[in-house]
Structure formats: C-alpha cells, structure tokens
C-alpha cells in the first residue's frame, strides 16, 4: 500500500516537472508579444540587441502602480532588474547601466538596474512548492 502511494506521488512529481519545463519553453520560444502593454506584457522577444547578453526574451511582472519586475532570458542565466512603466503604449528601453538603448516588441522600459543573479520564474516556484507538499504528504503517509 505504501509502495503504491509512493509510486503514484513520484509519477505526479515527475509529470509536474516535465509539464512545467515544456510550458516555459513554449512561452519563451514565441516570436511576438503574447500580451499587450495594458496586460503587463507577460513575454516579449527582444529586438535589435547589440550586446550578446541582451539577446533573448523578456518577462515583465506587475509589482506596483508604476513598477514592473523583469527578467531577460538568454541561453545562460537571466538578467534581473526593475522597470518603471511610462504613460502611453509606446515606450523606449534605455539600459543606462550599459549605455545601450534596446527596443522591445510593442513596448519599452527604463532599466533601473541589472544583475547576473538567477531568478526562478513563478511557475518554477509553484512547481517546487507543489513538490515539497507532495513529499511531505508521502512522509506523513509512510509514518502512519
């Protein structure tokens, strides 16, 4: 009985991780904005990048009334920072830390700061929490 329960939980965990990875890959391989500036621009492709580290995709997340958090995803680690949204639907992105202007599909932002710290996406965080909860349940089930 306990072995069957552990096998079921292991299968659920494995499926969750695989689905999460495929879902993220699907989102970041898009060639266009999946949302509009009014919908907080979930994923957009970077265009006209001149720096190798800036080539990739940007995810923008709502933080407060005029502030959005962003991660630039490339083949290595994402660049993380904060952005301030300006009025209107057309924006320009000025990466002041690098002295380079980057234009993004459908919108742009002012990059306040960037770093090489890796950030976990919300889906990855949800996957980790889900995994920990299931492992806790498995541990409790094995005790009783």
Curated annotation (Swiss-Prot):
A lipid is attached at residue 119 (GPI-like-anchor amidated serine). The keyword rRNA-binding does not apply. It is found in: Cell membrane. Residues 1-20 form the signal peptide. Glycans are attached at residues 48, 74, 90, 103, 116. One of its GO terms (cellular component) is side of membrane. Belongs to the ponticulin family. Residues 120-144 form a propeptide. It comes from the Eukaryota. The lineage of its organism: Eukaryota, Amoebozoa, Evosea, Eumycetozoa, Dictyostelia. This is Ponticulin-like protein L. Its main location: membrane. The keyword Repeat does not apply. It is a lipid-anchor; GPI-anchor.
